[in-house]
Amino acid sequence: MKKIILYSAVLLGALQLHAQKPQKIKPVKKFDTKVAEPSDIALNAAKDGFWIVGDGGVLYEVNLDGTIRRQADYQGLDCEGVYAEGKYVYVAEELSRKIKVFDAATLKVARTVTVPYNGARNKGYEGIAFNKTNDRFVVVVEKSPINIFELDKDFKIVNEINLGNIAKDVSAITYYNNSIWLLSDESMMVFRLNPADYTVTGSWKLPILNPEGLTFDAEGNMIVLSDDMQTIYSFTNPEKQQ
């Protein structure tokens, strides 16, 4: 397995991060959801709703206002990340190190893949996305250390990036507008990264308690999901607020 640790990228990103004070941004809308302990959120293929996973291990499809549309029969184990593209929905389980691939039409599990990681059981994969720049899936480890693993189309690890002390933790990852975006629960921040080398290109401070999920809607608004508050927050795209 080819593995590249981009320490120079991490150092440069850290210098960029500390050189600029993060801009504070505020949500413009919010919607409550009945999904218990929600952990991550992704826009569905029709762009008329979201996929949400939670600590209870269930995959939900919700409307844009957070009301539950349907849910999968499958009961997973500590689902922390969700990504959707085309006919499939990809769910990352933290404790088991498994990625479940669901058929979006039937909500049945079409494939299960184990992606090994030797870290602590409760410090595993917190998010999953697809890096369109590098044409690879990416999963992110919460902390100790904060790592991004790039995966090929068969979910084999082909690259590992150590993000150093970018934040206290990372709770979600997504790809939007040719950038990788990371969310930190403990730091209450969102970061924009160069998708080619994962250097930090922007950071923003959020007034959200326990932010766990991150995506963008069809209009380009940034969507943040709060676990404790069971609330979906909508922000004007941070790139338009610079």
Describe every region a protein language model picked out.
Residues 202-215:
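Conserved blade-ending motifs and adjacent loop-strand segments that build the rim/top face
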Residues 30-34, 71-75, 113-120, 161-166, ...:
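Surface loop/turn motifs at the tips and blade-to-blade linkers of beta-strand repeat domains
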Residues 34, 44, 51-56, 91-97, ...:
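Conserved beta-strand positions in repeat-built beta-propeller and related beta-rich domains
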Residues 37, 78, 124, 169, ...:
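Beta-rich catalytic cores
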